[in-house]
Amino acid sequence: KLINQVVLIDYTIIILGGYCMYNENYSIIFSSMTGNTRKLADKIHEILPKESCDYFGTADAQGIKSELLYIGFWTDKGNADSDTLDFLSKLKNKKIFLFGTAGFGGSNAYFQKILGNVKMSIDSSNTIVGEYMCQGKMPQSVRERYVKMKESPKHPDNIDALIENFDKALSHPDADDMEQLKNMII
């Protein structure tokens, strides 16, 4: 239920994405190929009350016992990775906070497109209570592939932009990304 006002009584109130959870238990479930999404998961775990955490780890049946799920993914071809999509498709009647990383950054529109694709795998009985995405560094092999492509006379017109994006991504998720995530959580 959406809240317009918060009244503090004798228990902790956590506000997240317009929803109020009174000491609600949660699980943090994530998939991380390069460690970027794991960093976001660790930050969420650091912020939230540890005693309310039912599960922290990769997709597992134990993680779905909580009503509130923080679900993290890495981006694969404009969508969440297949393990996360499979996990999401099985959920019913949950509150879900989506978080993820993508190698291509600098475009909120791109992040929104990814999140839109991810949400298509989520049953309508679930409620999305929040979402966050940021850029994440990519494996060095990606840059090597771009450089090799550039050597070809038939390389893509945007190859220099791809290499530049790769180099910008090396520091992500960075302190600013973590602060933005924190602000979404608290």
State where each predicted segment sits.
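Low-complexity, compositionally biased segments
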Residues: V7, I13-I14, K39, G63, ...
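FMN-binding flavodoxin-like domain, especially the glycine-rich phosphate-binding loop
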Residues: Y22-N25, I47-S52, S66-I71, D76-I186
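N-terminal beta1-alpha1 ligand-phosphate binding loop
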Residues: Y22-I47
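Exposed boundary/loop context
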Residues: I3, D10-Y11, I28, I71, ...
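Short acidic low-complexity segments
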Residues: D54-K65
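Short, Lys/Arg-enriched N-terminal segments with co-localized hydrophobic residues
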Residues: K1-C20
